[in-house]
Amino acid sequence: MVSKGVTLIVTAILTLGAIPIRAQHDSESERLGKLERAVEKLQNRNAELEDEVSSLKKRLASVPEYDANGNQKPKSESDGKALLEKPIPTEEKPPVFVVQRGPEIKLTLGGFIQANFEDGDVSAFEGRFGMTALKDRFRLRRARINLTGEFAEQFDFKVEGDFENSDGTNSNRTAFSATDIFVNWHRYPEAQIKVGQWKAPFGLEQTTPDTQLLSIERSLPTGAITPERQIGIQLWGKPFTNFWPEQKDLLTYYFGVFNGNGRNTTLNDNNNFMTVGRLELMPFKGQIFGQDASLKLGGDVLNSRDEKATNISQSLNLLVNADGSLSPYVLPGADERTAWSADAWLNIGPFDLIGEYLAEDVDGRTVAGVPPGFSNFDPSGYYIQASYFILPKKLQGVVKWEALEPDQVDDDNIHSLILGLNYYIHGDAIKLMANYVHTWSRFRETHPGFGNDNFDEVILRLQLMF
């Protein structure tokens, strides 16, 4: 009996002892599995690091080293067994570094070149015929370089110059001069403040960037009536940016105060300033016929009191000459002028339709008993432009009709029809453009003694942005 009891007790003890041993064995197997997986991951990562180190060594091997005196050190070559120093004759030149001097968080260097070939009645659509006619030519239309930047303190800036502006001593010679130079405080998208020199906010076509125009040149009414670049200050913004983010582009406003004498001038002609305002409304942005579509409307107003000898057509021509041609309008006496415009831009997929009407009242002022020396006149003009991508994002056809009435003599209207093709090699960055322009002079038609009243021109352009 005792022996049987002892046997039962020993059997029970052994059975109970086997349970933790088996559990312990299972636990060790799991741990070993985890360790194996971890080791495998480390091996894979180690292989990746070896590849990266090998790649970096290859890059460093191609970079020249310099000593404390700026002389290039000899390169080291390895035969796989020993490291041999073999001096390689190279030009001793210290490295060059370009870094920003200030605390900017963003700095961008860019620019663009536009080269033209102009044949036929060159620039006749701008009123340059008869006594102001131009000859066939190759022309560097624009060659600009710009620097833009941004600060963490909510300021951005732009400095741009053009190598193809008149140098001021000879209208046929060009030199480098400033186009855009401004600082913009953008802390609040609804109310930004801009100070410096840039295009006054007047006219859709005038404020469209040069590189994004669908015709090679802007229309005559745009050049005759809009104020172009000015020096001053501007308040502008998009009121719905934070209040209604989905419709942030619904409304954009601009209000600026400028000297009114054009760009790169140090003096104001009097103690008055040009005031300019513009509103842009985008009432629709969505899809039509399955295509992205939008409708943009705009309106502008301008007022300025100018003194004698001020050029009021700073972009193109407005003064009607004796033979019906045009030239810049330099005031023979003081004036007060008010201009306004309205524009619309409809886009439906590959199709764009743009129209703009511009008008101006130029009224003479008597100053210190001196009459203005000219009669009041009210120039006006418009253009309508349609374009369509024949090949999506590559080949675009353009048709444009424009007209200007200077309103200085009877029948002084000038009309032009432009037919164009644009080939986008790499978007706007590399673009080829071709325009055929036919121009009618109503003044020449009613006064045939002055010569031809119909003019034809072909313009070709290569554009490259960098």
Regions found by a protein language model. Give the residues of each.
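A general secondary-structure boundary signal
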Residues: L32-E36, L42-A47, E52-A61, F112-Q114, ...
